[in-house]
Curated annotation (Swiss-Prot):
The record marks 168, 176, 178, 187, 201 as: Important for interaction with integrin. The gene is IL1B. Residues 1-113 form a propeptide. Its main location: cytoplasm. GO terms for cellular component: cytosol; extracellular space; lysosome. CDD domains: beta-trefoil_IL1B (cd23296). This is Interleukin-1 beta. IL1B production occurs in 2 steps, each being controlled by different stimuli. First, inflammatory signals, such as LPS, stimulate the synthesis and promote the accumulation of cytosolic stores of pro-IL1B (priming). Then additional signals are required for inflammasome assembly, leading to CASP1 activation, pro-IL1B processing and eventually secretion of the active cytokine. IL1B processing and secretion are temporarily associated. The lineage of its organism: Eukaryota, Metazoa, Chordata, Craniata, Vertebrata.
Amino acid sequence: MATVPEPINEMMAYYSDENELLFEADGPKQMKSCIQHLDLGSMGDGNIQLQISHQLYNKSFRQVVSVIVAMEKLRNSAYAHVFHDDDLRSILSFIFEEEPVIFETSSDEFLCDAPVQSVKCKLQDREQKSLVLASPCVLKALHLLSQEMSREVVFCMSFVQGEERDNKIPVALGIKDKNLYLSCVKKGDTPTLQLEEVDPKVYPKRNMEKRFVFYKTEIKNTVEFESVLYPNWYISTSQIEERPVFLGHFRGGQDITDFRMETLSP
C-alpha cells in the first residue's frame, strides 16, 4: 500500500506580505505561474497573489498534497479575509438578474369581500312617527297605535366601506326580509329618496355604490342620515301625517331630520 508523505516535509515554502503570497516547491526547475483573483482583491485591503510551482506535464500526488496544505495555511493566515454581507451581495448580483417587482391592484370586490357587519333597528322621527311600508316601494311616516306596531319597518343597517369623519359612519339601510334599499337618485335637478330593489345574491356588500350610502351621525339621543352622494341632503319626514319619507335639504326647520333609533337583538 502506498504511503502518504508527511505534509510538513513536502509543504511549500511561502512568503507573504500585505500585497502578495508566494509559494514555491521542488526547486528552480519548475515553471511558475502567477494568479491574481480580481474579485477577491476587491474584497480586502490588498490583492491576493498565488504563485504555484509545478513541473510541466508532471503533476505528482506529492505536489497536490503540498498545494492543499499551502491553501490551508493561506486560509488560516492572519491576513485571511472576513466574509461580510456585502461580499455575498456582490456575488449574488453576478448570479441573479435583478428585476423590478410590479404590484397589481385588485378590484374593490376582492379587497372588500369580508362579511358585512350589520344591526337590525327601528326608526321613529322626533314626533314619534313610525316608518311603514305603505306600498311595495313607498315608505311613509305616521303614528301607530300599540296594536299596529307590527307594521313598523325593521331596517337592516349595514356598516359599509367609506371615509369616516367627524363622527360620521357610512351605512346602508335595507328593509329586513325585503330586497329593498334606500337610495338617492337625481330626478331633474333635485336629489330624491327611493326604495330600490337589489339582487340578494350581491347585496349587502362592503363596497356599496354611493347612492346607497348615508353618513350616520349621532346627536345626543338621536341620529340623522346624510346622503354621501349628495352632501347636506338628509333622510327627512314631514310634519304632516302619513307623508312619504323624502330627501330634505334643510335641518332644524319644518322637515324632521333627526330620528330615535331602537336597536334590536339579533
